[in-house]
UniProtKB/Swiss-Prot annotation:
Domain of life assignment: Bacteria
Catalytic activity: P(1),P(4)-bis(5'-adenosyl) tetraphosphate + H2O = 2 ADP + 2 H(+)
Stated name of the protein: Bis(5'-nucleosyl)-tetraphosphatase, symmetrical
Gene3D superfamilies: 3.60.21.10
Gene name, Swiss-Prot/TrEMBL: apaH
């Protein structure tokens, strides 16, 4: 009865299956946690979604910015970019079923027994856990409703970048989406910076990685996240687990077995290219 946490798959189906075989994942008894960005860049987004959906209650996942971008393409809001390699998925006979399932997935996972929280980009230090839960539910409710295309059309943008309980409407939903799926750096007060993508040692002052700023959630829970492949899984404080190691760029797909904190990796089938093409502003 093991819990396996795996970083951003990005359509790397063959590597995902090989990694699960390596750890002897058994859906009947084990649980798989996925940090989001299941799709795009790799060649197997369709197979990834079909497989993950088939796992039912054996999987716990969160949505990432590329997953949201896929939903926006599906809704006719965003352009299908060839480099994302999404056409086989969008043209599949079960595309409607898969994508309507995908849009009903959460932005946040919490296991109180394990004191473990997972979100694609992390947890902004401006939130306590109750606020994070409420904010996740706000976006999840819209995504699972019939009005989800209206939200997807309005989610693109970098502002507002400072949390306030007084935020409302689309501005509130956009901040929540950015915090859960796009965040990397913050100002010392926790305000989001949506522009810098430099490695932490090269980040302009006064910016800090979100996980370097103490917050209520990181002080009480472990946090697993993906999104930031250029970290290569390194440089985070104790209890903060960066799991995106750039499989779709030629790096590795990384798995953390929670019970003993042992790592497993599956090398990418692609050539190394760690230039993160994060043009998706979802």
């Amino acid at each position: 009865m093991a819990t396996y946490l795996i970083g951003d798959v990005h359509g790397c189906y063959d590597e995902l299956i090989a990694l699960l075989q390596q750890v002897e994942f058994t859906p009947d008894t084990d649980t798989l946690w996925l940090t989001g960005d299941l799709v795009a860049r790799g060649p197997g987004s369709l197979d990834v979604l079909r497989y993950v959906k088939s796992l039912g209650n054996s999987v716990r996942l969160v949505l990432g910015n590329h997953d949201l971008h896929l939903l926006a393409v599906f809704a006719g809001i965003s352009r299908n970019k060839p480099k994302d390699r999404l056409t086989p998925l969008l043209e599949a006979p079960d595309a409607d079923e898969l994508l309507n399932w995908l849009r009903r997935q959460p932005l946040l996972q919490v296991d109180e027994k394990k004191k473990l929280v997972m979100a694609h980009a992390g947890i902004t230090p401006q939130w306590d856990l109750q606020t994070a839960k409420e904010c996740a539910r706000d976006v999840e409710a819209v995504l699972s409703s019939d009005s989800y295309p209206f939200f997807l059309d309005a989610m693109y943008g970098d502002m507002p970048n400072n949390w306030s309980p007084e935020l409302s409407g689309l501005a509130r939903l956009r901040f929540i989406t950015n915090a859960f799926t796009r965040m990397r750096y913050c100002f010392p007060n926790g305000q989001l910076d949506m522009y810098s993508k430099a490695s932490p040692e090269n980040a302009p002052a006064p910016l800090k990685p979100w996980f370097a700023i103490p917050g209520p959630v990181s002080e009480a829970y472990s946090i697993a996240f993906g999104h930031w492949a250029s970290l290569e899984g390194k440089g985070t404080p104790e209890g903060i687990y960066a799991l995106d190691t750039g499989c779709c760029w030629g790096g590795e797909l990384t798995c953390l077995r929670w019970e003993d904190k042992q790592y497993f990796v599956q090398p990418s089938n692609r050539q190394m290219d760690m230039g993160e093409g994060e043009a998706v502003n979802a």
